[in-house]
Amino acid sequence: MEVEGEVREKEARVKGRQPETEVLHGLPQEQSIFNNMQHNHQPDSDRRRLSLENLPGLYNMSCTQLLALANATVATGSSIGASSSSLSSQHPTDSWINSWKMDSNPWTLSKMQKQQYDVSTPQKFLCDLNLTPEELVSTSTQRTEPESPQITLKTPGKSLSETDHEPHDRIKKSVLGTGSPAAVKKRKIARNDEKSQLETPTLKRKKIRPKVVREGKTKKASSKAGIKKSSIAATATKTSEESNYVRPKRLTRRSIRFDFDLQEEDEEFCGIDFTSAGHVEGSSGEENLTDTTLGMFGHVPKGRRGQRRSNGFKKTDNDCLSSMLSLVNTGPGSFMESEEDRPSDSQISLGRQRSIMATRPRNFRSLKKLLQRIIPSKRDRKGCKLPRGLPKLTVASKLQLKVFRKKRSQRNRVASQFNARILDLQWRRQNPTGTSLADIWERSLTIDAITKLFEELDINKEGLCLPHNRETALILYKKSYEEQKAIVKYSKKQKPKVQLDPETSRVWKLLMSSIDCDGVDGSDEEKRKWWEEERNMFHGRANSFIARMRVVQGNRTFSPWKGSVVDSVVGVFLTQNVADHSSSSAYMDLAAEFPVEWNFNKGSCHEEWGSSVTQETILNLDPRTGVSTPRIRNPTRVIIEEIDDDENDIDAVCSQESSKTSDSSITSADQSKTMLLDPFNTVLMNEQVDSQMVKGKGHIPYTDDLNDLSQGISMVSSASTHCELNLNEVPPEVELCSHQQDPESTIQTQDQQESTRTEDVKKNRKKPTTSKPKKKSKESAKSTQKKSVDWDSLRKEAESGGRKRERTERTMDTVDWDALRCTDVHKIANIIIKRGMNNMLAERIKAFLNRLVKKHGSIDLEWLRDVPPDKAKEYLLSINGLGLKSVECVRLLSLHQIAFPVDTNVGRIAVRLGWVPLQPLPDELQMHLLELYPVLESVQKYLWPRLCKLDQKTLYELHYHMITFGKVFCTKVKPNCNACPMKAECRHYSSARASARLALPEPEESDRTSVMIHERRSKRKPVVVNFRPSLFLYQEKEQEAQRSQNCEPIIEEPASPEPEYIEHDIEDYPRDKNNVGTSEDPWENKDVIPTIILNKEAGTSHDLVVNKEAGTSHDLVVLSTYAAAIPRRKLKIKEKLRTEHHVFELPDHHSILEGFERREAEDIVPYLLAIWTPGETVNSIQPPKQRCALFESNNTLCNENKCFQCNKTREEESQTVRGTILIPCRTAMRGGFPLNGTYFQTNEVFADHDSSINPIDVPTELIWDLKRRVAYLGSSVSSICKGLSVEAIKYNFQEGYVCVRGFDRENRKPKSLVKRLHCSHVAIRTKEKTEE
């Protein structure tokens, strides 16, 4: 009775908080029992069984009554929606009891818990026979409204309602069997609430094998087992705290067949029918697929080893198809599984891994077979139709999956755990969106593992895998920071920018259109005055630079080479982005591979190529003087050549020739002549030349345009007058005569990517061409259709009127371009492969030659010499691959027009010397730390408006000196600032010195170096000569008074003692015929003071100056002890970057040069002979030093080539030496090379390859009286002059010679220097490492 009272109290409490349920009529006792069962809260310790202690009425009820009570529950409508197959057959009680063990099967729980579209009952019952015991007792404390069960078993003695017996189609059946998605959540919440209210008595129970509901009659074995288990379940009074599952027998075969009903996207539900054979039948009418091994019961544990987790997983609403596909994870048709079916942490443990992974594929081969069975073949894909919401790669209409349990042998424990872990990771069930990164991080790595990874982290090692030059990368900055392990963020280096003012940009645009625009000199009076000052300043800078460089780098005035315009265009292709010695070697390879058949006499270099000289007119274009300027060693003249046409009209063509070449004549005739006196090959004027004025002594008449210029033209001789132009300084009037008529204004547009230029030509003769073009909007510019220019019309215009240029020896091609054009591009690329960028350059060269043939009919660009400079510039810019710098090189060096190319050397020098102002640099960046320099085009924008008024000769020499100065002194890396003659004006040097001195205060005026200079016999007081520091750290100018004060003599107190001469040698006394030794002091007589001639010739010879009048020499040269101690120069001096060879200058008529080509007339460099040291071989790096044992023993000469002592003795006895011939580069190139030979130095020679390998035996008597010089051999001019003093560099260019390559006279190809002549230190190190 006490128990019943407690039950009633609980019942009252529950009624107060739960809605009333419908009462079952006719069964009052059972109704109260079920109410007690419904509202009874079971403790969390045990909720596995029905509590019989709290339900006393249940002890007195028989099984029939219990079944009748269950049948009454079914009759109220709780079983509506169950499958028809399960309702038609009777199922024993034990099957109902054992069916709860299928909770671990995903198909009996989560995927079958789909709500169905049926009428829900307002009653809420505890014993829903459609639910498994696991679902019945495993509930939570939540309270929800009851939902109709999914599957209802037919109970004995009762039948379903009329609605259940109503036949329905497959689609309706699937809908009733599944339920609506919205009701699934409510029903599961209700079950959790019911489970939380139950109490399970602690009864011991026998392990029961799980059974599967199936259609038809059950097997006998299953029915017998069901009877036994049901009787045990009815009579048991005690249960264990922890019930253990029983594994099915391994021979038991179970398979599941699915039924898919294809509905709309919102009504896609499927019903599942469990057959008695263990299959799940689907409602589809298609054929069943073959059974496939699948992990259907992968989470059935081996036994109850721990308490079941109370909190369940989150539920999802995935259909049965997606849940099935989530197990296989096969891409688009992957099985989707809810989180409710995921195994717990205890189930994933390695201890139970065998039971968990029992039905999964053991390897990838079985997985492959599984996928082959699931994914249909092409035949099956054709006939199947998939719903819109499902993937269309697999057919999931019918799947018959089979699970086989076989007895297996015991495996290795370690291997099993490892494989189980791998398989578990591979088959881990995931959400549809995938596992988050945070979950992966937490599962994969622990704190200790992360700490270990950070300890093993190496930034240097990890940085190797990162791409370079990435702005977000972290790198170690410099060595000082690298030692401290400091990390700085990498930032891309930015180039400094030139500070361009608007006026400079305006004039630059005008100069790009025409050099004779009115606005070039300024738009107003103030601007004109400003431009005049700017240009005068830059003219002074240019002249000062040229004057200093002449002293150091030698004379580099204009001297024309042979070659055509096509040669120069191809030459600028090859000189892009590479050193000059590499590009020149590439061109020499092309010339050797495609030689030109010379029709001219090889000895014509010593003949006058224009031999018909009748008159030569000397023209001095200097307006200040009326006489010609003094001739230098190799002066340059402007020759006037006549070309007679059919009408006897003479077109005088201005060409360039040296003093050793003959000049063409001007025949006197009373006829019209078109004279081209401009040295830049532009038409100047049409002039009526009077024959009498040509022969007479008067001035040549000119038109009004050249009235000012005519004043400076005078006739020097009447019989033979030379036409000479002093172009070192040209008045501004000459520049205005660049062309006679104003050219048509053009608007030029350049496309760098496609390298094609088009222009819009506007013909307007009324308006001046110097007007500034109007700016167009971008839209109008895009809409305007650009027309291509007909360049062939420009050629026809230049050749019209019989003015076509005929090819001469000086304008002949140096390469057979037609043969090169017909050659395969790959062959051309292989020829210039040593230069680099060979494939791209080969394509550009061939495309350029094809363009000439296509547009002009021949490979000839000599007509560009006769067109206006602006037109020539536009045409060259239209060639693919030529930029502004390349075009300016062709115009200045080949067409001889006014231009100034700015290459990398010129741009770097202009910035360092301060010629080009830069925008303010960052505080931490100093001038000497600059690694990148402004864009060359911006440098040219600033320089060209200020240098455009210079003449072509000055611009040529300035350009030649600047590029050589950049190679020798002002290199990009480690410039030779100590020996630089321009360091007083260099900002780079000032910044480096100031940084080295840590910005010390400026030196005071008294901080100067004083040198006492004493005269030997003078009684005057010593004079102090003050040398200011070469570094100008301050720019303040001193007054003249201050300078004069510093030069005042200093009076010494006491005075320095005079030198005493106690004893003199007899040689110190002068001798005379009449008076011998009359003077005690040989230095008293001023007439006999030794005279030292400081010139080039006397400086190299040690002969005494002979007085021819007296017959004997009274002048003696005092040889100091220091001079006497200077050793004799060796034949070969090997250094790190260069090798010095003692060479002899060979005259042109020397017998040694028999078989060599005659030296070019314009070539100022002679042939040289380099002597071999006895015992040297071709590969000898150092002179031999070993001694011969055979010669020391019996004075017998050996026959070894490397024996120094024996070979020296043999050469001394035979009076012969071995030598190699050095050929002048201009002679080796036969006087023709692109870009006027600026690739080479003025004193450059090539080593004859034949005599370098097989030296020539030369008698010593033929060379003992020859002039001796020093030849510097190395890999490049920069490496040769690196680290030398300014005196050594000066001697190198003025007295010495440079050699960087060999030359094969047979095939005319460049060769590398043999090791005897020069071997780089890199090759020496490589050889030493190889020998070690």
UniProtKB/Swiss-Prot annotation:
Region (DEMETER): 497-595
Binding residues annotated for [4Fe-4S] cluster, in chain numbering: 970, 977, 980, 986
Keyword set, alphabetical order: 4Fe-4S, Activator, DNA-binding, Hydrolase, Iron, Iron-sulfur, Metal-binding, Nucleus, Transcription, Transcription regulation
EC assignment: 3.2.2.-
Coiled coil ranges: none
GO CC list: nucleus
Gene Ontology biological process terms from the UniProt entry: base-excision repair; chromosomal 5-methylcytosine DNA demethylation pathway
Composition skew (Basic and acidic residues), residue ranges: 1-23, 787-810
Cofactor-binding details, from the entry: Binds 1 [4Fe-4S] cluster. The cluster does not appear to play a role in catalysis, but is probably involved in the proper positioning of the enzyme along the DNA strand.
Composition bias, Polar residues: 137-153, 739-753
Molecular-function GO terms, alphabetical: 4 iron, 4 sulfur cluster binding; DNA binding; DNA demethylase activity; DNA N-glycosylase activity; metal ion binding
Localization: Nucleus
Positions with biased composition (Basic residues): 301-312, 763-777
Residue ranges of the region described as Disordered: 1-29, 137-242, 280-317, 739-810
PANTHER family assigned to the protein according to its UniProt record, in alphabetical order: DEMETER-LIKE PROTEIN 2-RELATED, TRANSCRIPTIONAL ACTIVATOR DEMETER
Family statement drawn from the similarity comment of this UniProt entry: Belongs to the DNA glycosylase family. DEMETER subfamily.
Domains (record comment): The DEMETER domain, which is present in proteins of the subfamily, is related to the J-domain, but lacks some important conserved residues.
Task of the protein: Potential transcriptional activator that may act by nicking the target promoter. Catalyzes the release of 5-methylcytosine (5-meC) from DNA by a glycosylase/lyase mechanism.
Note: Although strongly related to DNA glycosylase proteins, it differs from these proteins because of its large size and its unique N-terminal basic domain. The DNA repair function has not been proved and may not exist.
Listed name of the protein: DEMETER-like protein 2
Organism: Arabidopsis thaliana (Mouse-ear cress)
